[in-house]
Amino acid sequence: MVTVTLPDGSVRPFEGPVTVAEVASSIGAGLAKAALAGKVDGKLVDTSYVIDADAQLAIVTAKDAEALDLIRHDAAHVMAQAVQELYPGTQVTIGPAIEDGFYYDFAREQPFTPEDLEKIEKRMDEIVKRDLPIRREVWSRDEAMKVFGDLGETYKVQIIDEVIPKGEELSIYRQGEWFDVCRGPHLPSTGKLPRAFKLMKLAGAYWRGDSKNAMLQRIYGTAWAKKEDLEAYLHRLEEAEKRDHRRLAKQLDLLHMQDEAPGMVFWHPKGWIVWQQIEQYMREKFVEYGYQEVRTPAVMDRSMWEKSGHWENYRDNMFTTASENRDYAVKPMNCPGHVQIFNSGLHSYRDLPLRLAEFGSCHRNEPSGALHGIMRVRGFTQDDAHIFCMEEQVEQEVADFIVMLQKVYADFGFNDVLVKLSTRPDKRVGSDESWDKAESALAAALEKNGLSFDLQPGEGAFYGPKIEFTLKDTLGRLWQCGTIQLDFNLPVRLGAEFVAEDNTRKIPVMLHRAILGSMERFIGILIEHHAGNFPLWLAPVQVMVMNISERQAAYAEAVAEALRRAGIRAALDLSNNKINYKIREHSLQKLPYQLVVGDKEMEARVVAVRARGNQDMGQLGLDDLIARLRAEVLARQ
């Protein structure tokens, strides 16, 4: 007798072993038809999986979150079958489900083309229509290596021989005549794959991610449970493309990058204004929350990086140089320099907490393939700060930091923030007692600020637990920016200490913290979040003043000058172009306000105001306009 317990608590007895599909059929024909997989005691399995002992079972349908990975994994297999049917001799390697889709890597001498993708997608449709049963088989390692070897599938032989652990059961999934090595699980048949997939792009990929190995051809695709979901995803991609910071940065003349300085940014005047506004704002927040700003050297001797542990653990990502028989490294992080400032004087417990902040310019030797506009660079600036405090001060310091962070994010237009608390890993420094106190302090600080959080057990760094803050932008994309990290290790390595109340020397707790993260990346996020429509306080040009004809040129100049004297970033267009052309051109620059002056405005000593989005605000006197603009800037709307 086998007893199966369902999610609603009901129990179904069976005389002997039973498959997931049979349980679904016993519940109802509708569920049997909708079943894509099962969860047996929490483990995702095929519908053909045999339950031979009492178990808990949930039937997985297209409505369940777990179904999406199954659908994407099956789409990858169907694509691989389509490729091998259309292009015999092509070798398949690996093809997993990934976020928003799937990919498969192929070994083929002739490169795939965009036209090939259309053919492959059409063949995938045909394979789905065939409704081929998908069956799981277990083969011996020797049998599998011989079969794939005879087929010329050298990559599969290597996977079986080197990647799959020797003691692991070797499963093969077969759909029609096509089969592949795979752990599964999979859908019951190709016909269960929703026709809501699309092949997206081609890329190169080294075998097993090693540049010493052969270059393979990767085909990316996306797959969803419903066509409506696919269409919504494609729409989001279109929106993301319109908002791409690389395109908008060029359109708005903010910055550029070039091959002579890979991963480094050339900031143009307009882009640098945005940078300066953000830096000035953060500097105000440093003062408001009791931080002291410092500056540390960009290049330090190898001995410093050896003491901090960076030379041993991070050297491949550091730019190094030598001079006068000494080795140096360009700093990849600011923390060792801040410890040196702390160590430069004797500190009492009364001096703590000590908060040191820096717009620290760092460089990391990121692989060229990982660089992406200003989102992933080699030279970047962090809004970095380190708090030196006593254990009993940690909770309050973290709580105050969270208040500061929430205010900053809200002012930049981000109100949806996800929080993760990562706790002790197996390998760590520090006592269990210290970790207990630290983790409790972080959790308490979050609760004090009314923040819910996802607990990530074992995901903390070896030197301390951390909180990560992730922003959700207008398109629903997630960007991890803020962090606060306890460090039990670096103060010890670099000899930081303070005089305690009992006159003994003690080691401070060090809190690493950032809100924006990399300034470059944060500006990239801002550009995409606002689609280049910077709020007034950040806009490089806040107001454009335009005359209709030469008669109003002097008045237009006087208006622009008055705005500048009032602290408004105003520009002037006195060109001979028609006013509609001027308005259209400056609208493409996404300016917050455009002021038009004609004869009527000049005579009445007013301006005609157009707000972004083609909003006609009518005529305003200059004093009223300046008051409005100043209020909007101060409110950071």
UniProtKB/Swiss-Prot annotation:
Region of interest: Catalytic: 244-535
Pfam name, any one: tRNA_SAD
Listed GO MF terms: ATP binding; metal ion binding; threonine-tRNA ligase activity; tRNA binding
Leader sequence segment: none
Top-level taxon of the source organism: Bacteria
Keyword terms, alphabetized: Aminoacyl-tRNA synthetase, ATP-binding, Cytoplasm, Ligase, Metal-binding, Nucleotide-binding, Protein biosynthesis, RNA-binding, tRNA-binding, Zinc
InterPro entries: aa-tRNA-synt_IIb (IPR002314), aa-tRNA-synth_II (IPR006195), aa-tRNA-synth_II/BPL/LPL (IPR045864), Anticodon-bd (IPR004154), Anticodon-bd_dom_sf (IPR036621), Beta-grasp_dom_sf (IPR012675), TGS (IPR004095), TGS-like (IPR012676)
Subcellular location: Cytoplasm
Residue span, TGS domain: 1-61
Cofactor(s) of this protein: Zn(2+)
Binding site for Zn(2+): C335, H386, H512
Cofactor binding, per record: Binds 1 zinc ion per subunit.
PROSITE patterns in UniProt: AA_TRNA_LIGASE_II, TGS
SMART domains per the UniProt record, alphabetical: tRNA_SAD
GO CC aspect terms: cytosol
Catalytic reactions on record: tRNA(Thr) + L-threonine + ATP = L-threonyl-tRNA(Thr) + AMP + diphosphate + H(+)
E.C. number(s) listed in UniProt: 6.1.1.3
UniProt record, GO biological process: threonyl-tRNA aminoacylation
HAMAP family linked: Thr_tRNA_synth (MF_00184)
Annotated NCBIfam families: thrS (TIGR00418)
The protein's role, per its UniProt record: Catalyzes the attachment of threonine to tRNA(Thr) in a two-step reaction: L-threonine is first activated by ATP to form Thr-AMP and then transferred to the acceptor end of tRNA(Thr). Also edits incorrectly charged L-seryl-tRNA(Thr).
Subunit details: Homodimer.
Family designation: Belongs to the class-II aminoacyl-tRNA synthetase family.
Record's protein name: Threonine--tRNA ligase
Taxonomic source organism: Thiobacillus denitrificans (strain ATCC 25259 / T1)
